[in-house]
Amino acid sequence: MERITVNLAERSYPITIGAGLFEDSAHLSSLTAGQKVVVITNVTVAPLYADKILSLLQSLGCQASLLELPDGEQYKSLDTFNQVMSFLLEGSFARDVVVIALGGGVIGDLVGFSAACYQRGVDFIQIPTTLLSQVDSSVGGKTAVNHPLGKNMIGAFYQPKSVIIDTNCLKTLPEREFAAGIAEVIKYGIIYDAEFFTWLDEHLDALYSLDEQALTYAIARCCEIKAEVVAQDEKESGIRALLNLGHTFGHAIEAELGYGNWLHGEAVAAGTVMAARTAQLQGMIDQQQFDKIFSILSRAKLPVHTPESMTFDDFMTHMMRDKKVLSGKLRLVLPSSIGTAEVVADVPQEVIRQAIEDCRTIN
């Protein structure tokens, strides 16, 4: 078992990682007898894990309730947010309620935002069940819902009280969802840790075969990096923006093609290739470095090409709404080597256009 702390002074919290955590109530020991707890999950995750979590809560003497929501990125919306608010209000839950997000990134973001807003903020715990949410979205306090005009445009920075990661959840995860999570894992190697990138290149098969030791190491390393970055820059005014490698292109893909048609990690993978190609055209990385990035994402069974139906104008329409745009200037996160990245604000549109076009056929 691994334990990592996100250091944010009085708002610091633990991340616990290991196999079989759902069998031990010790990881929820901050909850007390009589405590009202609402577990919010979706219709896919509920049959797999809801009873286990409810049993742990009952063993602690908590008064536990369950809310099941529809499954899918399209439900990360204000309509579903209102559904959560109505459930909490109709149940007369007070400010001492604890909300648990049990699910993937959609549930984590939606429930976290709901916790931030309900009566101006109630405590919540993240229990991520997908690889993507375990290595990225459950850590760091970013919470949000989508708007038809942009992803994660309505949200708040709101930290959980703890994150509990049971790697056994990955045994029930479809391979497509697992691959989407691997995209975010690879991202950490590209932007922050060249040795980790090399390790991933050598252990990709072990990860896909769900080797417990490899999974625990990879998840823990990602969480360590995320915790280090968040401790330095909680509100994304500096270094934290680097965690968005591939996301500016990726969010454009998701918004244009419809939320849920591409998984978030799939869009990030294609976006990472476009960002790497942009960096290469800018002289920031060489052909060998680009090839390494392209190769590992391709081997991970992820999309690595520009969607056929999307034009340059489609991309720019959405990218200019990106949260990193300042004073009308598009800022892109680009790799400057394997293991480092930077935010670049002056990339000519013709370079972006060429990168998008090159990535239609590159191999």
Swiss-Prot record:
Key word Cell membrane present: no
One GO cellular component term: cytoplasm
Pathway of action: Metabolic intermediate biosynthesis; chorismate biosynthesis; chorismate from D-erythrose 4-phosphate and phosphoenolpyruvate: step 2/7
EC annotation from Swiss-Prot or TrEMBL: 4.2.3.4
InterPro entries registered for this protein in UniProt: Dehydroquinate_synthase, DHQ_synth_AroB, DHQ_synth_fam, DHQS/DOIS_N, DHQS_C
Keyword flag Signal: no
Principal subcellular localization: cytoplasm
Molecular functions (GO terms): 3-dehydroquinate synthase activity; metal ion binding; nucleotide binding
Localisation: Cytoplasm
Residues bound to Zn(2+): E184, H247, H264
Essential cofactor(s): NAD(+); Co(2+); Zn(2+)
Free-text cofactor note: Binds 1 divalent metal cation per subunit. Can use either Co(2+) or Zn(2+).
Top EC class for this record: lyase
Protein residues bound to NAD(+): 71-76, 105-109, 129-130, 142, 151, 169-172
Position of the signal peptide: none
Keywords of this entry: Amino-acid biosynthesis, Aromatic amino acid biosynthesis, Cobalt, Cytoplasm, Lyase, Metal-binding, NAD, Nucleotide-binding, Zinc
Catalyzed chemical reaction(s): 7-phospho-2-dehydro-3-deoxy-D-arabino-heptonate = 3-dehydroquinate + phosphate
Record-linked Pfam families: DHQ_synthase (PF01761), DHQS_C (PF24621)
Swiss-Prot/TrEMBL GO biological process terms: amino acid biosynthetic process; aromatic amino acid family biosynthetic process; chorismate biosynthetic process
HAMAP family assigned to the protein according to its UniProt record, in alphabetical order: DHQ_synthase (MF_00110)
Described purpose of this protein according to its UniProt entry: Catalyzes the conversion of 3-deoxy-D-arabino-heptulosonate 7-phosphate (DAHP) to dehydroquinate (DHQ).
Family: Belongs to the sugar phosphate cyclases superfamily. Dehydroquinate synthase family.
Record protein name field: 3-dehydroquinate synthase
Organism encoding this protein: Vibrio vulnificus (strain CMCP6)
